[in-house]
């Protein structure tokens, strides 16, 4: 049975608005506490990068290859790949605010970029989105990221 909520005090079913408010906040606090147990966000590449490439999920390999290629060809880039997104790692805001240019590369319509904007205000995020049903093509990533660096 779903959709039932227990009383904060007795554990019995409750439909009271005040109790609902308490329970919503209690559940959110439990999720937020998970951040104490997940690893911090790591950045690969140049510490003083001109562009931070951000990804999550199954995009790691293609984005890492793009970063490695660009660095080998003299571009100052870095790469952060999120393994946890709710909650975000505790150092997410500190890491992202270090970079003037950030590109979030996703194989969807950009939901993670929007989520980051909501969770970390003040970011200047560019997006590279593809909805092809196929993995990224590394050459396309390199071309798009190089163009961003030149802007």
What is each of the regions a protein language model found here?
Residues 1-151:
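Flexible, low-complexity linker and terminal segments
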């Amino acid at each position: 049975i779903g959709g039932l909520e227990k009383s904060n005090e007795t554990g019995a079913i409750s439909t009271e608005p005040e109790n609902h408010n308490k329970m919503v906040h209690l559940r959110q606090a439990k999720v937020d506490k998970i951040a104490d147990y997940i690893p911090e966000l790591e950045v690969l590449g140049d510490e003083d990068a001109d562009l931070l490439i951000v990804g999550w999920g199954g995009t790691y390999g293609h984005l890492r290859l793009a970063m490695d290629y660009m660095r080998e060809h003299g571009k100052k880039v870095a790469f952060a790949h999120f393994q946890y997104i709710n909650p975000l790692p505790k150092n997410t805001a500190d890491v992202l605010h270090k970079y003037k240019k950030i590109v979030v590369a996703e194989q969807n319509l950009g939901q993670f970029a929007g989520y980051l904007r909501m969770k970390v205000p003040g970011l200047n995020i560019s997006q590279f989105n593809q909805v092809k049903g196929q993995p990224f093509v590394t050459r396309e990533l390199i071309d798009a990221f190089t163009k961003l660096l030149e802007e």
